[in-house]
From Swiss-Prot:
Keywords: Fatty acid biosynthesis, Fatty acid metabolism, Lipid biosynthesis, Lipid metabolism, Lyase, Membrane, Transmembrane, Transmembrane helix. The gene is hpo-8. This is Very-long-chain (3R)-3-hydroxyacyl-CoA dehydratase hpo-8. GO terms for biological process: fatty acid elongation; sphingolipid biosynthetic process; very long-chain fatty acid biosynthetic process. It is an enzyme of class 4 (lyase). It catalyses: a very-long-chain (3R)-3-hydroxyacyl-CoA = a very-long-chain (2E)-enoyl-CoA + H2O. Pathway: Lipid metabolism; fatty acid biosynthesis. GO terms for molecular function: 3-hydroxyacyl-CoA dehydratase activity; very-long-chain (3R)-3-hydroxyacyl-CoA dehydratase activity. GO terms for cellular component: endoplasmic reticulum membrane. Belongs to the very long-chain fatty acids dehydratase HACD family. The keyword Transmembrane applies. Its EC number is 4.2.1.134.
Amino acid sequence: MSVQTYLVAYNVLQILGWSAILVKTVLGLANGLTWPQLYESVEFELKIFQTAAILEVIHAIVGLVRSPVGTTAMQVTSRVVLVWPILHLCSTARFSIGVPLLLVAWSVTEVIRYSFYALSVLKQPIPYFLLYLRYTLFYVLYPMGVSGELLTLFASLNEVDEKKILTLEMPNRLNMGISFWWVLIIAALSYIPGFPQLYFYMIGQRKKILGGGSKKKQ
């Protein structure tokens, strides 16, 4: 299998997976599911396709794609932590309004992003509407996603603290302690410099790519 075939297959599978999550999320919201019920309706697909994104870090490391390793690793790690240590282990997190916010933001973003990547790998022209969506919807989707992630994270803190989830207390053979509660607090604080930097970067990219929008459409 060629690298191109592999990358196309990966991106197409991600498009299908996140499309399924998006459809289930919209239907769940339309049918008035509670936030825990909404999460349960997409839990299987969410765990599979978000965990599969770890491959993107490997793609960047071995040079299959030109994505920066550090940025890719941080973005993937933050989501994987939300899916597994937080939403999987902390039932209270599923009651947060952050759940529908992050599900909508993630799924719409990923369907657009992977469609963009698939066409890029195939060296096909990117339709203007796809460029427009990719470099416009982030104005709403990024704040929505970050809000959803933080609200879900905050909703898990009490349970993490009470149950000592993923926490290593002293004394122990390693003679060291690790508090997952503090790990989450530090992760939340990292959004303060991280979000504005990424947000304004995307604004710059939008001006660069869509600045001559009328010419591109022609």
